[in-house]
Amino acid sequence: MKPAQSIPDGRFGVSSSLHSMLTFSSIVTAGKKGFMSTAKPLSGIRVVELGQLLAGPFTGAILGYFGAEVIKIEPPGGDPLRQWREVHNGTSFWYRSLGRNKKSVVLDLKTEKGRDVTRRLLKTADVVIENFRPGTMEKWALGPADIKPDNPGLIYARISGYGQTGPFSQKPGYASVTEGYAGFRYINGHKDEPPVRPNISLGDTVAAIHAALGVTLAIIQRHQSNAGQVLSLIHI
């Protein structure tokens, strides 16, 4: 798996990820003649993933396991997760895990051209996932209110440390911070010793699992109402 490369003029550069989990994401059913067939429950659902590191990408990975088409938008140089922790053959094991079952396109959201291509993608999407600091998508004119007129059925999943509003909304929201603030680390470890961080980023992974569940429920409800939703998930 090669690191993402810059793509001139905002053109799409799609690369399928390795390690697809075809059997994991399949539901086995019996056909009319008794033959076994497989169907993925999220087949036909297009997800645009905006976000980096763990919570957003893990949400996209879960939806991809179950058949969704996940298009990951990465900045020039790629998601930092590609080089996070231990790296093998130019790519981290973390990215090999959370980048599978996805397509990837490099777009610079700090440029108008990059935002324009992203906006066109969001108009065709069923779901968008983002885990930027609250207000960032609105600054780029890519927030829910900006996209809704052209795509009223869009399900917009937002993951942040402390929520989209409130006194802490603009504070850095990494799981390592919110786990400590919530007291989770205090209850781990040994008596009379400092708090201990678990060997997995639970703030990110639990938020992502709840985000994937929320997206799935919103898809079910959209079949009844034809309306999209905005979901707010937090680490704390």
Language model: regions and residue ranges:
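Intrinsically disordered, low-complexity regions enriched in Ser/Pro/Gly/Gln/His and often acidic
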Residues: 3-6, 77
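Low-acidity, Ser/Thr- and Arg-rich intrinsically disordered low-complexity segments
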Residues: 6, 11, 15-20, 25-26
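Residue-level detector of conserved catalytic or cofactor/ligand-binding positions
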Residues: 5, 232-235
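N-terminal helix-loop segment corresponding to the beta1-alpha1 unit
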Residues: 22-226, 234
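Intrinsically disordered, low-complexity polyampholyte segments enriched for Lys and acidic residues
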Residues: 2, 9, 32-33
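Flexible, acidic loop-helix segments that line cofactor/substrate-binding pockets
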Residues: 229
